[in-house]
Amino acid sequence: DYSFLCASFGQGYRNPSVVEKYLRKDIGGVGVYPNENIRAEKGYNAELGFKQGYKFGNLKGFIDVAGFYTRYKDMIEFRFGLFNNKTFDYIDGLSKLFNAFSSGDGLGIGAQFTNVGRAEIYGVDLSTSGVYEFNRDTRLAYTLGYVYTNPIDMDVDSRNAEEEANDDLMAMRSKSDDSKYLKYRQKHSVKGVFDLEWKQFNIGTNMSWKSKTLAVDYFMVDERTKAEPNLMDYMRSMLFGNLHDYWAENNKGYFVMDMRVGMKVTKNIHVQGLVNNLLNKRYSARPMDVGAPRTFILQVGANF
């Protein structure tokens, strides 16, 4: 009983949003730059899954297993770097750098959305959720999940060869390494949510673990091994200090745990205390984006 088999296939395209194509804005010294030449991304997605219910005594729930595959053409992603403040050109060579200075257009640091070419993302999603009834007043609800993702840049070989042949001192690369992976992705992700209820009281926790980030923007970090520093290494040091060393030491898998304790004061009023990042773990999924430290929150909810 309670067995389900599902499959899906979809195909379509997505036009760039107004923000991705036209927005120009400065936020805290970092700019967002428009790209009117950005193209719509196209692709298709296929998924096959199986869902099975289970019941063992007072324990009941579902387990869900799904495999997915997505293929993109002209995939849209953002790139971080230097830009001409007037023409919004991405600075990827000495000539563009000198032109920005000589023309008086000026330079800015920021992000711009662009097409990265062909990509495929596939993986497996495993999850289970259920409830265990201890007695009439006590129950434990849980959700456990694991996701494996393999995000592949299908044009990596030709792009690496083109970038390697470029001997411009200010030549930019698409990402921080020569791997086949897309930027800002993690291969493995694990989560767990548990909530124990007893009469009007409840205590719960959220736990998550993610593996290291596979690649980031070259403008901030270069993970390649070099005999001597190049011009971009000196520029990074001036702009971002020891960010390169920090990322090399801290780009690892990280575990974060949150806790919460609550009570129903009346039928309509609920009070809950939360501690986010209980272990005060220092973590970062992207350079210059450090996760929030331990945080205490008190919530009061009312239904009328």
PLM regions with names:
Residues D1, K42, Y54-G57, R71, ...:
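Outer-membrane beta-barrel strand-turn architecture
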Residues N58, A66-R71, Y90-F219:
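Gram-negative outer-membrane beta-barrel transporters
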Residues K42-A46, E120-V124, Q186-V190, G253-M257, ...:
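Residues that define the transmembrane beta-barrel architecture of outer-membrane proteins
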Residues Y22-V30, R79-F88, D153-S174, M220-P229, ...:
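Flexible, surface-exposed loop regions and adjacent strand-edge segments
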Residues Y13-R14, D74, F80-F83, S208-H244, ...:
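C-terminal beta-signal and adjacent terminal beta-strands/loops
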Residues D1-A46, G67-A111, T213-L214, N280-P293:
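Surface-exposed extracellular loop regions of Gram-negative outer-membrane beta-barrel proteins
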